[in-house]
């Protein structure tokens, strides 16, 4: 609800040819199939794709983490894995931001649109944090 509306507003405001790639890491229910890609596709002319393992990130595309997966980026490609901790103990945003900072360095920025809890805040304490806006 709040997160979905924030994503829709964000993508409606962007030009589809910005040259940037967007990777979304919302907290999705692992027991249900997600239709987030279909919903967001109505808000942008960019392709909105459910992330696949080993897919190279391309400009002007939106990638969405699939339910019940962890995601990292290594050498510009998304890496998916099955979580090894219970759902309430996962921090998928922190994990992705850490890998993004290591892989892309100064070429990356994180935008936290909405949410509750602390997932996504650990990056602020890292040695090499990403610029974050939208808190």
Positions of PLM-derived features:
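Conserved acid/base catalytic micro-environments in cytosolic active-site loops
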Residues: 1-135
């Amino acid at each position: 609800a709040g997160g979905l509306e924030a994503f829709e507003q964000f993508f409606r405001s962007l030009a589809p040819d910005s040259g940037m790639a967007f990777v979304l890491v919302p907290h999705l229910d692992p027991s249900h199939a997600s239709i987030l890609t279909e919903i967001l596709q109505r808000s942008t002319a960019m392709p909105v794709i459910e992330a696949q393992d080993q897919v190279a990130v391309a400009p002007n595309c939106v990638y969405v983490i699939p339910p019940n997966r962890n995601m990292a980026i290594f050498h510009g490609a998304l890496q998916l894995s099955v979580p090894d901790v219970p759902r309430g103990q996962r921090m998928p945003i922190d994990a992705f931001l850490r890998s993004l900072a290591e892989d892309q360095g100064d070429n990356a920025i994180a935008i936290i649109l909405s949410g509750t809890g602390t997932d996504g805040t650990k990056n602020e304490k890292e040695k090499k944090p990403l610029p974050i806006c939208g808190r």
